[in-house]
Every structure is written in structure tokens, then in C-alpha cells.
Amino acid sequence: LSDEAVKQGKKHQVLLMIDMGDLREGIWFTEYDQIRDTVKLIEDLPGVELYGLGTNFNCYGTVMPTVKNGEDFLAIGHKIEKELGIHIKRFSAGNCTSYVLIDRHQWPKGLNHLRIGGLHEYGIEYVAMHYLDQYHHSTKDVMKACSPLYKLKAEIIELDKKPTVPVGELGVDAFL
């Protein structure tokens, strides 16, 4: 990535993923040294900028977003900031299913980025399965949360060993 960025004269922003128990992607949350060393590596790569740290909840492994796992994620980032003397701009705490904490006014202070797709397109809060206000269909019951909205083709860029059982309070998976 660095070589190609330099070749193209570009700066690629990278969101380093930390797996907080959902088994989706990223470095396993208990592997602090590996997380820190990867941040150091990114900081030293020409043409690459650490955009922030990211995680996912309630996707592959059905681990619910909670105040605790959000704060644990932030603690990893703050420890890295202190240890390396850097500022991490973004703490991206999940996908559409993390919105439930915002909806319930429980979003941990310091989480400042959220990656949403279906929530934006359909207005569905996927944990409690209800439409958000201000959508034209917000008074209707949510009957189904599956759609052919996106098709994704990608190559595998990460292979790692992780536990086979998710860690945290479980909910429904993202493959309704």
C-alpha cells in the first residue's frame, strides 16, 4: 500500500481494525503489542496515514455494542496515544448496529466515527428493529431487514488465527 501510494503521489488514509470480540476483522483486542507495533509501522510508512482505529460489533459474531466494549476499545487507543506520543483522530466504533447506543443516549464519549450503510439507506435501527424517526416509512413495522442493496467483490487481504467463539454480550448477526 505504501509503495503504491508513493508511486501514485498519494496519501492513503488507513483505519486500523481491532477485533473487540465479534470475530469480524482486525487484530484481536488482547494482542496489545501487535496493535501498538502495527500503529508504529503505519506511522513510519511513506504515503500512508493512520486515519484512526476501528472496530465492529453485532456483525459476524453477534457481539452487541455496549458502553463497556466501547470504552475498552477507547482505552486501547488512549494507551497507544500515550505510549507513542501521537493523536488518534478517529475512533470508529462499528457499523449500523452500533447506532443503538446513540439511539439510547449511551454512546461512549470519545467514539467519534461510525460506518453506516443500511441504516442510512433504509432508516432501520437493526438491534431493536425499528425505523428511525424522520424517514417517510418510520411509522411502519419492520418486516424484513434483508435487501439486495449492495454487491461486494473483494480479495482476501488478511488471514489470522482467532478464537472460534465471540467474546461479549450476544445479539443477532448481520446476516438476518
For each feature predicted by the language model, list its residue ranges.
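Active-site anion/phosphate-binding pocket segments in diverse small-molecule metabolic enzymes
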Residues: K68-L176
